[in-house]
C-alpha cells in the first residue's frame, strides 16, 4: 500500500466537513512521531499548523539525545515544517513549564514521592495551554504524536462525546501517561498514530523525507541534563539532600544516607548498607528524613488509595463504584499490561484493589484504569497514588515505626 493510499485510512478526524475546511494544530516536539502526524494530516488535505513549545533551555539538556522541546528540537520541527510546506510557530512556555512541571516535580521528591512529570506536562502545558492556543487560532482540533487511540464514545448514554482506547502498538502504549486527560480535552484532541506500530511511523518518516526519521525517541524526563534528576532537585530544593537515617522496619537503625531524593520505593541496589540479607526501600519518611527498608515481601501491595481522580466512565464515579465496586483493569506501571482490579469509594477514600499484588508501588505514581486487558481496551481514567497498603504484618510495623519519636 502506498503512502497516499495509507494516509486516509489512518485518521479521518471524525469531522463532518471536508479536510481542506478543517484546521488542525499539531503539537510538534521535534521528534519523529509528531512530525509524521503533521505529514499525514497534510497529505489528507487538512489545513495544518505546527506549533512547538520551548519548555526549557538549560545547558546539557538542550542537546542531549532524547530530549524534547529544547533548542535542537525546535530547529528540527522548523525544518520538518519547511519540508511539508506548513506554517510553524514557536511559543515560549519556559516560565509556565517551570511553574507547573519542574517545580512540582522537585516538591514531590522532597515529599518522598516518585512523580511522573509527563502527566503534569500533559495536564497543564500541552492539553490546557496549547489546546487553548489552538482554539484561539480557529483550529478544529489539536493533534499529537501520542500512541493512544480516540474515537466516538460507543455508549448511547454519551452521544457526541469521544473516548480513549489503548493503541494498536502495545509496546508504545502511552495511555498510562494520559489518564488525566479530561473529557473536554478528549473531545478536541486527535491521535493519528493510535493505529500504527512505531516501525511504520519511522518508515513513513523516511518516505516523507523528514530529517528526523532516524532521530532517537524522547526520554521520560526530558528536562533533566544527562538524566540526573537529583541535580535538578538539589538545585531547586536543597533540603532534599539533607542526611538522615536508614531504618529497618523492625526499628533498627542500619546507617545513614545523603538525602531521600536518591531513593525510590522498591530500590535494592545502592542503598549503602551491608546486613547480610537482601533489603529493599519500603517507605520514604520525608518528615523525619528516614529511608525505611525491609524484606521483599514487605513491598507486596494489593490496595492503592488515589487522589486527583479523573473519571472517564459513562456513569458518575460514585455510581460506577457503588456496592461491590467497579470491576476493571489497572496499570500501576507504564510498562505493565492492565491487570484485574476493582475500584471502590467509601469513607476511607477512593481506592483500587489489585487482584494480583504489585511490589514497589510509590506515592506520586499513577494508577490508570481500563475496560479490558487488550489493545482495544477503553481508558476509564485513573488517579495519582496517594498511599498503598502492604500485607498486614508489614503495614503494622510501618505504622508503629512512623508513630515512634525520632532521635534529634
UniProtKB/Swiss-Prot annotation:
It catalyses: S-sulfanyl-L-cysteinyl-[protein] + uridine(34) in tRNA + AH2 + ATP = 2-thiouridine(34) in tRNA + L-cysteinyl-[protein] + A + AMP + diphosphate + H(+). Keywords: ATP-binding, Cytoplasm, Disulfide bond, Nucleotide-binding, RNA-binding, Transferase, tRNA processing, tRNA-binding. Its main location: cytoplasm. Gene3D superfamilies: Adenine nucleotide alpha hydrolases-like domains, HUPs, Translation factors. ATP binds at residues 27-34, 53, 145. The active site is at 121 (nucleophile), 222 (cysteine persulfide intermediate). One of its GO terms (cellular component) is cytoplasm. Transmembrane segments: none annotated. The record marks 146, 365 as: Interaction with tRNA. SUPFAM superfamilies: Adenine nucleotide alpha hydrolases-like. It is found in: Cytoplasm. Residues 172-174 are annotated as: Interaction with tRNA. GO terms for biological process: tRNA wobble position uridine thiolation. The keyword RNA-binding applies. One of its GO terms (molecular function) is tRNA-uridine 2-sulfurtransferase activity. The keyword Disulfide bond applies. Disulfide bonds join 121-222. Its EC number is 2.8.1.13. Catalyzes the 2-thiolation of uridine at the wobble position (U34) of tRNA, leading to the formation of s(2)U34. Belongs to the MnmA/TRMU family. This is tRNA-specific 2-thiouridylase MnmA.
Amino acid at each position: 500500500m502506498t503512502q497516499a493510499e495509507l494516509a486516509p485510512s489512518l485518521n479521518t478526524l471524525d469531522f463532518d466537513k471536508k479536510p481542506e475546511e478543517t484546521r488542525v494544530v499539531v503539537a510538534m516536539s521535534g521528534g519523529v512521531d509528531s512530525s509524521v502526524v503533521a505529514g499525514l494530516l497534510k497529505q489528507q488535505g487538512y489545513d495544518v499548523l505546527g506549533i512547538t513549545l520551548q519548555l526549557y533551555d538549560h545547558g546539557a539538556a538542550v542537546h542531549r539525545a532524547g530530549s524534547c522541546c529544547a533548542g535542537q528540537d525546535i530547529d528540527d520541527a522548523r525544518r520538518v515544517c519547511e519540508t511539508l510546506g506548513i506554517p510553524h510557530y514557536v511559543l515560549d512556555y519556559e516560565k509556565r513549564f517551570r511553574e507547573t512541571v519542574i517545580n512540582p516535580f522537585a516538591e514531590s521528591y522532597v515529599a518522598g514521592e516518585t512523580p511522573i512529570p509527563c502527566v503534569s506536562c500533559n495536564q497543564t502545558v500541552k492539553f490546557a495551554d496549547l489546546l487553548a492556543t489552538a482554539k484561539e487560532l480557529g483550529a478544529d482540533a489539536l493533534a499529537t504524536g501520542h500512541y493512544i487511540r480516540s474515537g466516538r464514545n460507543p455508549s448511547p448514554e454519551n452521544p457526541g462525546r469521544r473516548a480513549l482506547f489503548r493503541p494498536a502498538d502495545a509496546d508504545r502504549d502511552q495511555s498510562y501517561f494520559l489518564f488525566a486527560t479530561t473529557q473536554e480535552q478528549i473531545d478536541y484532541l486527535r491521535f493519528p498514530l493510535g493505529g500504527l506500530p512505531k516501525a511504520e511511523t519511522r518508515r513513513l518518516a523516511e518516505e516523507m523525507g523528514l530529517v528526523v526519521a532516524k532521530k532517537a525517541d524522547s526520554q521520560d524526563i526530558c528536562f533533566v541534563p544527562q538524566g540526573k534528576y537529583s541535580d535538578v532537585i538539589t538545585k531547586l530544593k536543597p533540603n532534599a539532600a539533607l542526611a538522615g537515617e536508614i531504618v529497618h522496619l523492625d526499628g533498627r537503625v542500619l546507617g545513614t544516607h545523603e538525602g531521600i531524593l536518591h531513593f525510590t520505593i522498591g530500590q535494592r541496589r545502592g542503598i549503602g548498607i551491608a546486613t547480610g540479607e537482601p533489603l529493599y526501600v519500603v517507605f520514604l519518611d520525608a518528615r523525619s528524613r528516614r529511608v525505611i527498608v525491609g524484606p521483599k515481601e514487605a513491598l507486596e501491595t494489593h490496595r492503592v488509595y488515589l487522589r486527583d481522580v479523573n473519571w472517564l466512565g459513562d456513569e458518575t464515579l460514585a455510581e460506577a463504584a457503588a456496592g461491590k465496586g467497579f470491576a476493571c483493569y489497572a496499570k500501576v506501571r507504564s510498562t505493565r499490561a492492565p491487570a484485574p482490579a476493582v475500584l471502590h469509594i467509601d469513607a476511607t477514600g477512593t481506592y483500587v484493589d489489585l487482584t494480583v499484588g504489585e511490589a514497589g508501588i510509590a506515592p506520586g505514581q499513577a494508577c490508570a484504569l481500563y475496560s479490558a486487558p487488550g489493545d482495544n481496551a477503553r481508558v476509564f481514567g485513573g488517579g495519582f497514588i496517594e498511599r498503598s497498603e502492604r500485607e498486614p504484618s508489614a503495614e503494622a510495623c510501618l505504622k508503629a515505626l512512623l508513630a515512634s519519636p525520632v532521635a534529634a
